[in-house]
Amino acid sequence: MSPDNKLLPKRIILVRHGESEGNLDTAAYTTTPDHKIQLTDSGLLQAQEAGARLHALISSNPSSPEWRVYFYVSPYDRTRSTLREIGRSFSRRRVIGVREECRIREQDFGNFQVKERMRATKKVRERFGRFFYRFPEGESAADVFDRVSSFLESLWRDIDMNRLHINPSHELNFVIVSHGLTSRVFLMKWFKWSVEQFEGLNNPGNSEIRVMELGQGGDYSLAIHHTEEELATWGLSPEMIADQKWRANAHKGEWKEDCKWYFGDFFDHMADSDKECETEATEDREEEEEEEGKRVNLLTSSEYSNEPELYNGQCC
């Protein structure tokens, strides 16, 4: 299938796991490996409710009755359990596949976590910067960014090759069951947000759903399903919200020149392009006038040099 004819998923939906034992009491991390932390009873219920919301959302368009879902899930126990509960809302024929994907796992905070030491470490992280700080024996958000970027490349290859879209008449939805920071990094990578913008984002709640929906022009936006107020509570700035609204109707491949993080943050000292053009035009006119003056002088000199010399009123 050519890139021009590739079939894009209608939605890419990020879901954070339900409430875990570690969310309820961080002391759990001191005795239990992070990847083995389980959901609480409340977390299981949250995951079931998330499944019902997902089903209602995906099946809401009566003009697209033949929809399908493909799931990606982090290998951690709490995300796998969340997906298991979400799956109760879907019949088998609606799910075309599930893939456990290590690259969307939680940020590694460094093996067993001693409570007091972790509290002090997180204070240092706030001073250093949440994106670049690397936990001892663990990862930074920048490390997570690298592996999420790799995952996205694989995701796009699957889309380009139409590996997941079994039937072109089916409306496809991707659901990614992952973790709070990983979901924020995913959005950062997808929408090309800066480090500063990432550090202003708030973590999603347990079993919270964030929906990237395909707009009419072929670009994805958070502003189709979510309100401006929701986006603001997530930590998106007014400029970021405006960009999401633009993406909802933009044609794929269009360049939004007035996004400040694409240009203005680096080149705000430059002269306005219109003024620069006016200056260049003035300089060009001055050069042309100078050249014209030189040509006139040369012609005048030539005329005088070709006139016959006169002696006593007669030609010699």
UniProtKB/Swiss-Prot annotation:
Active site per the UniProt annotation: 17 (tele-phosphohistidine intermediate), 106 (proton donor/acceptor)
PROSITE patterns reported for this sequence: PG_MUTASE
Disulphide-bridged cysteine pairs: none
Stored Pfam families: His_Phos_1
Annotated InterPro entries: His_Pase_superF_clade-1, His_PPase_superfam, PG/BPGM_mutase_AS, PGM-Related
GO biological process: carbohydrate metabolic process
Induction: By sucrose.
Stretches the record annotates as Disordered: 275-316
Positions with biased composition (Acidic residues): 279-291
Gene3D superfamilies linked: Phosphoglycerate mutase-like (3.40.50.1240)
Top-rank lineage group of the source organism: Eukaryota
UniProt GO MF annotations: catalytic activity
Tissue specificity note: Expressed in roots, leaves, stems, flowers and siliques.
Function according to Swiss-Prot or TrEMBL: Phosphoglycerate mutase-like protein lacking PGM activity. May play a role in carbohydrates metabolism.
Family, similarity comment: Belongs to the phosphoglycerate mutase family.
Name assigned to this protein: Phosphoglycerate mutase-like protein AT74
Protein species of origin: Arabidopsis thaliana (Mouse-ear cress)
